[in-house]
Amino acid sequence: ANTEIVHGGATRHESEYNALQYLRGDIEAGLIDLVLIHDGARPLATAELFVAIAAGAQTHGGAIPTIALDPREMDTAREETIARVQTPQSFRATQLLQAYEKAAVSGFVGTDTAACMEAFFPDVNTVAVPGDIFNIKITYPQDLAIAELLIPVQ
């Protein structure tokens, strides 16, 4: 497979926009049905998670991996279900490109891919796919040490 590099932006949102602009021609030509967006901060995402996310987006329009919060972490005053959201996240390519273009025009900057889709395509059914507790985000130096311990588990 060929590897192509797209320069990122100052924010996650801008990096995703740049990638979608790079893919624009193929998306508009109907050569790309789905886009999966993943960040390098979660290096332990499994192939099975990517497959599940792609299948969920193909069937429903969008898919995000989630991990249920421990009840001790939840704000019991809120009625809606709250979960930790991970990457990769996947959506149908045409709508995702349109969402990011609308975001660029309006100045919207989403915290993740799903936030941008929800802002501009609230009717897209984004399904929650079971995430992976080992798909940790590397934010601090100690996270890297934990990830190194988890590699043999996978």
Annotated model-derived regions:
Residues 35-36:
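Short aromatic/hydrophobic "clamp" motif used to bind/position activated sugar donors
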Residues 19, 39, 68, 92, ...:
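Residue-level signal for inorganic ion chemistry
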Residues 12, 40-44:
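Acidic metal-phosphate-binding loop of nucleotide-sugar-dependent transferases
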Residues 125-130, 135-139:
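Conserved active-site beta-strand element of glycosyltransferases/polysaccharide synthases
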Residues 1-32:
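Short phosphate-binding loop-to-helix
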Residues 44-129:
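Conserved core of the sugar-phosphate nucleotidyltransferase
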Residues 135-154:
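Hydrophobic helical membrane-anchoring modules
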